Amino acid sequence: MLIEWRAANANQPFRKLDHLSYTHIFAGNSFDRGDHERRDEELLKKMIQQDNTKLLPFHKLQPLVRRSPNAELAWIGHDFLDGLPEEAGGPKFLGFDADRTPHFAVDISAVEDPSKIAALASDAAFEDGRAAATDIPQEQSGILAQARANLNWHSQHRFCSVCGTESQSFRGGLMRQCPNCSSQHFPRTDPVAIMLVYKGDKCVMGQTLARQNSSFYSCLAGFMDQGEAIEEGVAREVMEEAGISIKNVQYHSSQPWPFPSSLMIGCLAEAATTEINMDPEEMTDVKWFSRADVLLALQEKNENLQLPGPIAIAHHLIKSWANHEF
């Protein structure tokens, strides 16, 4: 069966992502996620054992990364799987690369000595995913996001929310099903509206409670509510955090943020009112900044204003407005 499958799919066209207008770090994943193949549980088991299959281990949600000669995700073969404890949960299917090579991620947090697995790849170590994402190739950061978010979901949702029975992973990790009540559970993605509010040559930015007594400011943001359009979520969050009414909401771009599993929906919005009425339970400070001050901060030449770095969608929303790019 496996030989027949590989022969039939050897020349299958690979769907390369080339339609993204603005690709952030943690986006740009080029894998074909193999929706058809992941529905065949027996095929998945056989794919894991293929000689060319590649696995990306994570230890406490830190991916294995190789630093020499260039930073990249460190993929290894499947031989180490036989020694994994049962609580590791098994490999989760990520998809196929352009050569139709299957790729999986696996959580090895239950392993007592992860250095032995790290040693299976030359010059590799388990690293913080956020730090590694700025150094590895762009499309690999998208793979990292997919793998980290999925493994974290499995670790946090082992038990059925209906009856409490331990559930089982299916579809290569894209579903858990309860063996007792047959309830199906799917990985969650939490949508977040993040927006830069502007009026002429000024924009509004805020400082959260975690950043108090610093010069760090960023876009306003908040989780979307159920039954809420993106534009409505933007307006609500701006009103809640800054007390400002807005109009002319424009979509800019989006960014997966796998800490743990958010989708940042980036927008720009024009202020309809300008008086700030900040919510002190959410924010330390909210204020207007001039375009000139923002441009200096983007060049790291403004000691009174620090902005998010390029890893974050907030940086690109701010930069887009400051440079008249929207």
Residue spans of the language-model regions?
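Nudix hydrolase/Nudix homology domain
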Residues: 2-157, 168, 212-217, 279-326
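Short Pro/Gly-enriched beta-strand edge/turn motifs at strand-loop
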Residues: 75-78, 175-180, 249
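Short acidic-glycine loop/turn motifs at beta-strand connectors
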Residues: 97-100, 199-201, 273
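Cys/His-rich short segments
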Residues: 145-200
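N-terminal strand-loop-strand
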Residues: 176-218, 223-224, 245-246, 269
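The catalytic Nudix box helix
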Residues: 218-253, 267, 273-275
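A short, glycine/Asx- and small/polar-enriched loop/turn
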Residues: 259-264
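Solvent-exposed residues in well-ordered beta-strands and their adjoining turns
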Residues: 270-272, 289-290
